[in-house]
Amino acid sequence: MKTIEEINQLNVKKILSEKKIPDFFPGDVIKVGVRITEGKKDRIQYFEGVCIARKNRDINSSFTVRKISFGEGVERTFPLYGTVIDTITVIRHGKVRRAKLYYLRDRTGKSARIAEKIRKKIGIEVDVKPEMVTEETLAPVAAEAEKQTEVQAEPKIEKSEEKK
């Protein structure tokens, strides 16, 4: 018999196989696409703001996004694995030292800004596209290589003749 935790973990794996959820943390500016049904029509409404909290509770995980709209602070809490979430996009990463940024509720203007976190890239990103190697693709490369060797060899001969 499966426990509730095992069932929740299976559901999380199933949801993650269907849609990709990016890594984001409190302080990051994110754009959440929310699926809204009005009558028979479905549309996507975007909510962009600063992630001020994230709760990791298996299938019950959620996050709170805060934005300032027409001078008023608006906060919205979303279920991380909910069906209403269409997309989550990280706009920029914020540099903070707290897990919950509830202190931003009391601040406005410049004091509510969060510095951008600069992430160092480790390693070299190489985009390799496999191509079929055939005689047709090798012929132009071989011809150019022969021309370069001929051009390099000729000036050396001329210089040696001039010295004599």
UniProtKB/Swiss-Prot annotation:
Keywords: Ribonucleoprotein, Ribosomal protein. GO terms for cellular component: cytosolic large ribosomal subunit. It comes from the Bacteria. GO terms for biological process: translation. SUPFAM superfamilies: Translation proteins SH3-like domain. GO terms for molecular function: structural constituent of ribosome. It holds the Pfam family Ribosomal_L19. Residues 144-164 are annotated as: Disordered. InterPro entries: Ribosomal_bL19, Ribosomal_bL19_CS, Ribosomal_bL19_sf, Translation_prot_SH3-like_sf. Disulfide bonds: none annotated. PANTHER family: LARGE RIBOSOMAL SUBUNIT PROTEIN BL19M, RIBOSOMAL PROTEIN L19. Belongs to the bacterial ribosomal protein bL19 family. This protein is located at the 30S-50S ribosomal subunit interface and may play a role in the structure and function of the aminoacyl-tRNA binding site. This is Large ribosomal subunit protein bL19. It comes from Pelagibacter ubique (strain HTCC1062).
